[in-house]
Amino acid sequence: MKTHGLLKAANAVSDAVFCGTTAAFVLVIADDPTGIQSDSVIAAGPVLDALELPWVASGPATIGCDLSRIVARSERLGLPAAIVIDAADASTPAVATDAEPVPPSPTYRRDPVRHLLVPALIRHQRAVLSARLAGTDPPPPPPLPRFPDGIPPRWRPALDRYAPLFRAFAARRSSFTAGDIGISSCYGFPPYDAIDVVTYMGGAIPLAIGAHLAGRTDAWAVTGDFSFISAGHLGLLEAVAREVPLRILLLANGQAETTGGQPVPSSLLDRVLDGYADAIVPLDDPLDEHACEHALKETVSRDELSVVVARFPPP
């Protein structure tokens, strides 16, 4: 990608830095200092430094060795990394080199202290990132907040409304569930443990697609109407393009609960969902646990893209 593409993906990249990675994750950035292929000139280095990505500049004569080394570095640190080339060199043949052997990637395991990017854990995650970049030992993990006592009181009324749905959802635990930052992310805490990774608004669906393609074929994404309309629907397009039979739980409560309660018109959500009518599994009474169980059971029985739309009544 070019630096402009990196800027568009910066929220996802930054969250990958804080979450860490299981396998190597290397971005190949085409820097365009003369603007021959870009609408503006943006230097890649300062952007990568701001995102705290390890990176190296390379060219046709050294890219083989440099790429091998940056992959190994990403794997060793458990962090994303980048290699920067000049866009003007894109058509220049590279010198072939023997790749350095990279040890097998460790297997993914659930690590909510590291992977739930929520305010209660962000200071620890910041300290872990600093230690990784400095090559020192990370601090010991803090205890996870427990639901509901460890949850801010102002969020509990909204979370209580979600409880019947998440009791049913947790009972059908999949091997991987991605969530968006928001109040529902609290259901990643014990005793529910219903969400494994929480990142930026709109990140749940792309993450779940990646998990599915990596072999977690029962993966779920949990998102809210505000996050879905803001960015998550782009992931739905990707699921269709890749023909991924993903399972999505969409919490439609009609407002941006976490950021101040801004209204989300149901007509706007319906307009976005109109193109996916065959994928919709309606859940019109998410306060009824039996209705939730029925909708989730129907979803897991389908071998196609499925979106459970849980429409909550006004509080």
Which residue stretches match the model-derived regions?
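Hydrophobic alpha-helical scaffolding
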Residues: K2-T3, P33-S38, V56-P60, H115, ...
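Short secondary-structure boundary/capping segments
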Residues: I42-G45, T97-P101, Y192-I195, L236-L237, ...
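Short amphipathic alpha-helical segments and helix-helix/interface helices
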Residues: V13-V17, A44-G45, V71, L165-F166, ...
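Acidic, Ser/Thr-rich peripheral helices and adjacent loops at domain boundaries
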Residues: A99-R110, D196-G203, P263-G275
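Catalytic-loop motifs flanking and including active-site residues across diverse enzymes
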Residues: S40, R161-L165, Y200-L207, G235, ...
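Thiamine diphosphate
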Residues: M1-V56, A61-E75, I181-E257, ...
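Flexible, low-complexity linker and terminal segments
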Residues: L53-I183, L283-P315
